[in-house]
Amino acid sequence: MEVIGKSKAKAIIESHLNDSVIYFSDHVRILKHNPYCTSVSYLKDHGVYQWVFQVNDPRENPITAVFFVEQNEEHIDLNGNTPAGPLSSEEPLPPGTLSGKCIRWVNSPKVPDVELKEKHTFVGQANTRICLYHLDDQRTEVHFETDITLDFELSFPLNMMPENILKFMTEAIMSKIMQQATESMLCQVQSDICCSGAELTASGCKI
């Protein structure tokens, strides 16, 4: 059964763009702020990062989700629009943008041949776009959005239920998990680089 989860976040941080880029380019550091992420590692031989997440199904049975992603960076064209992301199309740049950079975590087109040790382990797909906009007063506006897709099998007796009901239940849980993870990561960003709480918003949604 395939389920999809999505989340969006925006924040104004009291940090110069150059410092913000260094912070958000630290792939391992950012992912370790996610309370459901148990491991992040760079597979040098394959040129990809491996994420390992641990969640529970509706009956509290553990599920291990593994993702393989590549990290890319690109400059934002001030004469153009915000680069399209996994959840949104191109849109105008935030008012007052002086410069910007976009960091992407893109699902690897090829799954590396690595051993998956945990039981009930499933390989998913993940795509993230982090846009960083340099504003005045040494501030950076951050637009963070991500979506994940996971195709997995549920244990008995859940697998005896109608799939449409299972899908609804599972995606509701996925939505809750991603909302909690987004809020947790934003709180950690706030702690690390003095994020302005009054200008921080987060939202999660499901399909």
For each feature predicted by the language model, list its residue ranges.
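A conserved amphipathic terminal alpha-helix motif
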Residues: L158-I207
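Hydrophobic ligand-binding cavity/cleft-lining segments
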Residues: M1-D77, N81-L87, L93
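A broadly tuned preference for mixed-charge, low-complexity surface segments
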Residues: D57-Q71, L132-H134, S191-K206
